């Protein structure tokens, strides 16, 4: 409701024009506080729609947030991980908060058990999680298209002023040198005489 109520703000500010708003910064030093906001507003001007279109997107965004909310409830409230057994046979609870600590244990059995505890539970819900992921992709594709972005990736990076080439170059560079990671894992397995690393 709040989004719908203030949806007129950006289109009306853009209608005032950059020249007029820039003059405010010289006339009133208190306006300097908002310089970054207006810079971003005019930089992304082509992605701001009319008041009517913004109102529709505000209503739709409320519904589209459900995908994120459903995953958040599942991940933070509903999913439970089985306890694992410690060195002395004691039960060790597994949670999101403890998982990283358990993976840093010097005991390979604790690391392995913690990994299996978490991922066996997620594995049970893989179809649900895949459906949520697909719905999220459709949401972002919808908003990217309506706001005249070339892709969902471009929309996601726009706020940080990051060109998509930075992202794709990063992925390409990782792929290019993946053989080094494979070699490292292979050497580590050999040194530890292990079939799998945990």
Describe the residue ranges of each PLM region.
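A well-structured
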Residues: 1-198
């Amino acid at each position: 409701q709040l989004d719908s109520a203030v949806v007129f703000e950006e289109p009306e500010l853009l209608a005032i024009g950059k020249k007029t708003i820039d003059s405010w910064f010289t006339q009133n030093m208190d306006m300097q506080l908002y310089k970054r906001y207006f810079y971003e507003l005019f930089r992304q001007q082509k992605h701001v729609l009319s008041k009517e279109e913004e109102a529709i997107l505000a209503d739709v965004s409320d519904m589209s947030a459900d995908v994120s909310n459903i995953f958040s409830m599942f991940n933070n409230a509903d999913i439970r991980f089985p306890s694992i057994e410690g060195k002395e046979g004691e039960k060790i609870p597994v949670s999101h908060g403890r998982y990283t600590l358990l993976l840093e244990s010097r005991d390979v059995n604790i690391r392995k058990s913690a990994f299996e505890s978490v991922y066996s539970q997620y594995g049970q819900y893989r179809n649900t999680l895949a459906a949520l992921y697909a719905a999220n992709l459709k949401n972002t594709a919808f908003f990217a298209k309506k706001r005249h972005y070339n892709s969902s990736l471009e929309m996601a990076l726009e706020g940080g002023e990051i060109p998509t080439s930075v992202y794709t170059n990063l992925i390409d560079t990782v792929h290019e040198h993946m053989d080094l990671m494979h070699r490292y894992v292979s050497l580590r397995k050999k040194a530890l005489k292990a079939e799998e690393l945990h």
